[in-house]
């Protein structure tokens, strides 16, 4: 079974993930992922949990705004081998997601992740 770490910021944007969280988790579960879910509590929380648990999963998915995504990537940069990264935009502007064409509707973004849609990836060197 594939393992996923799902990190989300419940305060991002207008807290819109709260109404869609169960649908998102259902999409991942039905796709065969063993989920570990982490709700961010404070600044740098996403970075710390990804740095600590990222090596134990096949994919890290974060949901929040550009700040949550930045923290998630910062945590991944501390890993020797990076898992795949998925992003479900839930912030107020979502500039990064818009620039890559990631769907703004959260369930659609979740489906893209499980279907293996790929966008330009981070280089392994971090540069």
Regions found by a protein language model. Give the residues of each.
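Generic detector of intrinsically disordered, low-complexity, polar/charged segments
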Residues: 10, 61-64, 72, 83, ...
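Catalytic core of DAGKc-family lipid kinases
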Residues: 5, 31, 78-127
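Short, basic, helix/turn surface patches
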Residues: 61-68, 115-120
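ATP/NTP phosphate-donor binding region
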Residues: 1-63, 74-75, 108
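Phosphate- and divalent-cation-binding pockets in alpha/beta enzyme and binding domains
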Residues: 48, 71-72, 95-96
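Short Gly/Thr/Asp-enriched flexible loops that form oxyanion-binding sites at enzyme active sites
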Residues: 68-80
């Amino acid at each position: 079974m594939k393992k996923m770490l799902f990190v989300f910021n419940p305060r991002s944007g207008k807290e819109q993930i709260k109404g869609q969280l169960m649908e998102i988790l259902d999409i991942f579960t039905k796709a065969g992922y063993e989920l570990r879910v982490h709700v961010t509590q404070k600044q740098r929380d996403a970075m710390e949990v990804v740095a600590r648990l990222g090596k134990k999963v096949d994919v890290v998915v974060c949901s929040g705004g550009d700040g949550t995504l930045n923290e998630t990537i910062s945590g991944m940069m501390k890993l020797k081998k990076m898992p795949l990264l998925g992003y479900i935009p839930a912030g107020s502007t979502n500039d990064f997601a818009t620039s890559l064409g990631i769907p703004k509707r959260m369930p659609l973004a979740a489906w893209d992740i499980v279907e293996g849609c790929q966008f330009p990836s981070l280089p392994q060197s971090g540069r």
